[in-house]
């Protein structure tokens, strides 16, 4: 499809969007050339190594130096503060719309072209209680977790992934099997399904499945795919127990699964 409908619900008020635009700019300042923390810290590391007459050892030694330096502590404090500011604003804005947003999810749960398979008896492993990147309630304990994640990553990527450009680019780099046949694709820990839909667009005739432990994430994934007309199936399953037969898929993909292992 050349264009896609807007799948990210608007914030409650324009002042919320303006505030988060500021937070996005703050993140750009912290990570980019505005504050230039990385270059300044690299310079401090080189000067320290030169003055003591030996190179740095392992990563842990470098980490201790950075965390002990005022510049490193300032960078870390600013990075955490902007993350806290982001989540506070998104959570507050979506919480004010909770009734409308839950109704919006329910409206799409049974719609096609793909399927949404949730397990009412699903038991979450203890490792899913680790809350990455400070997201409030983690990835599954709030029925709006999928919407929170979607807007949170919008700020995280500083607008560079608003139309799933990053996922499309990554999916485009995945090599096809040696025989060139791609009939079934599995997206592990698919969250809100951005890579899953990208695979469907690359291989429109293939059967695409995205699995995740989080029902709120999967509901948003299904809604996004259905709104865009992408025939992708989503199921609440664990990556260590997918429920599919061995060698069932021609392509298996994991976008950020191994980054977020506790």
Q: For the regions a protein language model found, what residue spans apply to each?
A:
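A short SAM/SAH-binding and catalytic strip from SAM-dependent methyltransferases
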Residues: 251-262
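A short mid-domain helix/strand-loop element embedded in enzyme catalytic domains
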Residues: 125, 139-164, 194
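A short acidic, Gly/Pro-enriched loop at the edge of an enzyme's catalytic core
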Residues: 240-252
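Class I SAM-dependent methyltransferase SAM/SAH-binding core
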Residues: 186, 196-241
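N-terminal auxiliary segments of SAM/dcSAM-dependent transferases
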Residues: 56-140
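Conserved class I S-adenosyl-L-methionine
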Residues: 181-191
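Conserved alpha-helix/loop element of class I SAM-dependent methyltransferases that forms part
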Residues: 148, 161-181
